[in-house]
Amino acid sequence: MNSGILQVFQRELICPICMNYFIDPVTIDCGHSFCRPCFYLNWKDSPFLVQCSECTKSTGQINLKTNIHFKKMASLARKVSLWLFLSSEEQMCGTHRETKKMFCEVDRSLLCLLCSSSQEHRDHRHCPIESAAEEHQEKLLQKMQSLWEKACENHRNLNVETTRTRCWKDYVNLRLEAIRAEYQKMPAFHHEEEKHNLEMLKKKGKDIFHRLHLSKAKMAHRREILRGMYEELNEMCHKPDVELLQAFGDILHRSESVLLHMPQPLNPELSAGPITGLRDRLNQFRVHITLHHEEANSDIFLCEILRSMCIGCDHQDVPYFTATPRSFLAWGAQTFTSGKYYWEVHVGDSWNWAFGVCNMYWKEKNQNEKIDGEDGLFLLGCVKNDIQRSLFTTSPLLLQYIPRPTSRVGLFLDCEAKTVSFVDVNQSSLIYTIPNCSFSPPLRPIFCCIHF
């Protein structure tokens, strides 16, 4: 083959980032190709988009497939380079004047066939240099993939912890305000209980805030360790075959230790103390709600809205589901325009539910009519996937860091005050009060259950 053509052929197999032959090559949607490790390292801290280093176009591809054609060609090019290296005069066996073709895994040396069968090496494990290099490189790539997956998991967890830390003080203040407002509706002799409960809530809030900071720092430190180990493996993977074999050492063992004891995000629970007489006060406004399930487009439409609110990618702290759900939605037979009303719902040990009240137009809309986000939905919901659970309220969407109610949940609707309050009946404690609700009467109770 003409040397010029050979050089062009070789250039096509060179990664533009590391300037070495491709290692596990991937081709992104703009058409340019890179080593997978080089592309990943170029991703840096951007969770969604990265710019192509060749054309600067952005790509959001994450699950990249290996370009098998480039991988085979790059492997062939590396074999040619290895063969040329081993065929050189300097690499001939000094004793037998033969080409070294075998690799001794015990002392990590290159041997000719005669040396590999000598008394010194007879009991050692040998294999052809070419296959040994491929095997070692594949082990490195597998370990790098594990490291990258852990790095991505740690990155997601760090984002969750950063968001929680940033919003935590505001969340604690919202809880304090809601509990103060509830005590204002109670008799004056509750003053000492109110003071005690608020002080305990503040103390718990400060303790959790401190733990969130520590958790975030651990994840940030682990991010640097994971990246450093990944870069070290990448550097080893790109070494010429002979150098890779001789320098391999304990790098796999060290990388395995990095994967141990990965920090996990906290599951903060800011439980509030019981409010004496809370249920007795609310029972003065007790009503019985009759639910009717209807098979209609509006039901399907609303369930999809609820599901998207629960698992929307804009809320990193909320679990994401990949399963296709089956949704059950029931409307209350009653409607409310004024006054105060209280009812309870038995949730038991179930997950993936939401209930509350909504503006009437939700029932009248069909799936082709657009409603902005959660406007007019005043709900308490609970969702769970394989790794976490979340309790939330809507209008606006707000995660509630409290223990999940395990039996009955009460709802108190105050049409004049424009508030919807949720209480844990067993604990006689306030979960949250949605203030300043944008009611557009009549209001109708709803209950939604999503099965995954």
Swiss-Prot record:
Q: Which InterPro entries match?
A: B30.2/SPRY, B30.2/SPRY_sf, Butyrophylin_SPRY, ConA-like_dom_sf, SPRY_dom, TRIM/RBCC, Znf_B-box, Znf_RING
Q: Where are the transmembrane segments?
A: none
The protein's UniProt keywords, in alphabetical order, are:
Metal-binding, Zinc, Zinc-finger
Q: Taxonomically, which superkingdom?
A: Eukaryota
Output the PROSITE patterns linked to this UniProt entry: B302_SPRY (PS50188), ZF_BBOX (PS50119), ZF_RING_2 (PS50089)
Segments forming domain B30.2/SPRY: 269-452
Protein residues bound to Zn(2+): C93, H96, C115, H121
Q: Name one Pfam family in it.
A: SPRY
Q: Name one GO molecular function term.
A: ubiquitin protein ligase activity
Give the record's GO CC terms: cytoplasm
The Gene Ontology biological process annotation of the record reads: innate immune response; regulation of gene expression
Q: Is the Zinc-finger keyword given for this protein?
A: yes
Where are the annotated RING-type zinc-finger regions?
Answer: 15-56
Q: Where are the zinc fingers (B box-type)?
A: 88-129
Which family does the record assign? Belongs to the TRIM/RBCC family.
**What name appears for this protein in its UniProt entry?**
Putative tripartite motif-containing protein 49B
Q: Which organism is it from?
A: Homo sapiens (Human)
